[in-house]
């Protein structure tokens, strides 16, 4: 029953009652007016509670059908159930290789799957398609030298169609704004560089991730320096 119907019923009830004069009739009209107000207020409150979900069926009690699951959740759930044949690689830096950035795939949290190869410190693309290419390095030093220091990180491609190295991604950072004064306390600094992008690659393309100052690499913790590709 709607609020308007309730009000009409109360008004009809008022008209049906005999018009009593005097204090008793005034009290009756006051009572009916108060009752009408409380009825309207109660109906309004009930509508608000139902509308905003304060009362009624709770979410935990609703059936768990696909209409309540977001499209993104459905996509993630379905993709996790289907084995992927997309090329995937994630290699990590060798902590024992001093003075160079050497990639390893036979380590914890590293992998080569579905045709990707690690050859001559390069990832070899097994099939044509779109790929997410990414890499991260972490530099660490103590104090700032007199000469201006630049740290570079790049991902390059040598394509089958043209045997020339071309930068896909690159970044430059400088950890020092000015030289550390002689005799002053030298403070440690850290500079991470992350690269990532999507590219159309061909079968047989070779990808390399390189830096200019490997002596400043921080290899103390695993997972700080890595390189990988994911077929899309």
Curated annotation (Swiss-Prot):
Q: Which gene encodes it?
A: TNF
What's the protein name?
Tumor necrosis factor
Stretches of the chain found on the membrane's Cytoplasmic side: 1-34
Please indicate the ranges of residues that lie on the Extracellular side.
Answer: 56-232
The cellular location(s) given in this protein's UniProt record come to: Cell membrane
Q: What is the lineage of its organism?
A: Eukaryota, Metazoa, Chordata, Craniata, Vertebrata
Any one of the GO BP annotations: extrinsic apoptotic signaling pathway via death domain receptors
Organism, per UniProt? Callithrix jacchus (White-tufted-ear marmoset)
Its family? Belongs to the tumor necrosis factor family.
Family matches, as PANTHER family: TUMOR NECROSIS FACTOR, TUMOR NECROSIS FACTOR FAMILY MEMBER
Kindly list the residue ranges recorded as spanning the membrane: 35-55
């Amino acid at each position: 029953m709607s609020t308007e119907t309730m009000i009409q019923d109360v008004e009809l009830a008022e008209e049906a009652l005999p018009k009593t004069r005097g204090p008793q009739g005034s009290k009756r009209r006051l009572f009916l007016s108060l009752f009408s107000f409380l009825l309207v207020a109660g109906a309004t409150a009930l509508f608000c509670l139902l509308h905003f979900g304060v009362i009624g069926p709770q979410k935990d009690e609703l059936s768990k059908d696909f209409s309540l699951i977001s499209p993104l959740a459905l996509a993630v759930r379905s993709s996790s159930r289907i084995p992927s044949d997309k090329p995937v690689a994630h290699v990590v830096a060798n902590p024992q290789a001093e003075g160079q950035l050497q990639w390893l795939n036979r380590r914890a949290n590293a992998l080569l799957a579905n045709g990707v190869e690690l050859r001559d410190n390069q990832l070899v693309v097994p099939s044509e398609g779109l790929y997410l290419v990414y890499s991260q390095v972490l530099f660490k030093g103590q104090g700032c030298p007199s000469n201006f220091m630049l740290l570079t990180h790049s991902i390059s491609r040598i394509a089958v169609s043209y045997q020339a190295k071309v930068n896909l991604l690159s970044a430059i950072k400088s950890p020092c704004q000015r030289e550390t004064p002689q005799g002053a306390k030298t403070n440690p600094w850290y500079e991470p560089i992350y690269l990532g992008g999507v590219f159309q690659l061909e079968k047989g393309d070779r990808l390399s991730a390189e830096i200019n100052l490997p002596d400043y690499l921080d290899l103390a913790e695993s997972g700080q320096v890595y390189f990988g590709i994911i077929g899309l």
